[in-house]
Amino acid sequence: MRVMGLDVGSKTVGVAISDPLGFTAQGVEIIKINEEAKEFGFDRLGELVKEYQVDKFVVGLPKNMNNTEGPRVEASKAYGDKIKEIFNLPVDYQDERLTTVQAERMLVEQADVSRGKRKKVIDKLAAQLILQNYLDRMF
């Protein structure tokens, strides 16, 4: 079963995909979106769903450290509802607290990536971490 992980932000959606057996996650790409213009990248997402033969989505939920839900959680859930409607595939949610911090730390400490380059890959890596955490929890 192929699972697609999404890190939904206000300007981008980081995309990751699982291997066919659902054990490992790898980052795929970052889709630019514009919430104010109602451009959410669904066309590109559809292309990736077909290419990877996706069976399920996992959307990261950016909860606060005290486990409360802020406005970005609402936006992520709305995105999840919309992709469920468009693609007719199940959507699960994964707590994504600290995944962006973890991704940033990995890029700085392990890969020594410059700040400019980090901005180009951080959301994709965060999506990969969200999906891997989900897969680890499920299997």
Curated annotation (Swiss-Prot):
| Predominant cellular place of this UniProt entry's protein | cytoplasm
Enumerate the SMART domains for this protein: YqgFc
Gene3D superfamilies named among the record's database cross-references: YqgF/RNase H-like domain
The UniProt record lists the keyword Cell membrane: no
One cellular component term from this protein's GO annotations in UniProt: cytosol
Query: What are the protein's GO molecular function terms?
Result: nuclease activity
In its keyword annotation, does this UniProt entry include Nuclease? yes
User: Cellular location of this protein?
Assistant: Cytoplasm
Q: Where is the signal peptide?
A: none
Q: Which SUPFAM superfamilies match?
A: Ribonuclease H-like
Biological processes annotated in GO? rRNA 5'-end processing
Give the record's keywords alphabetically.
Cytoplasm, Hydrolase, Nuclease, Ribosome biogenesis
Task: Give the EC number.
Answer: 3.1.-.-
Q: What does this protein do?
A: Could be a nuclease involved in processing of the 5'-end of pre-16S rRNA.
Question: Record's family?
Answer: Belongs to the YqgF nuclease family.
In Swiss-Prot or TrEMBL terms, this protein is called Putative pre-16S rRNA nuclease
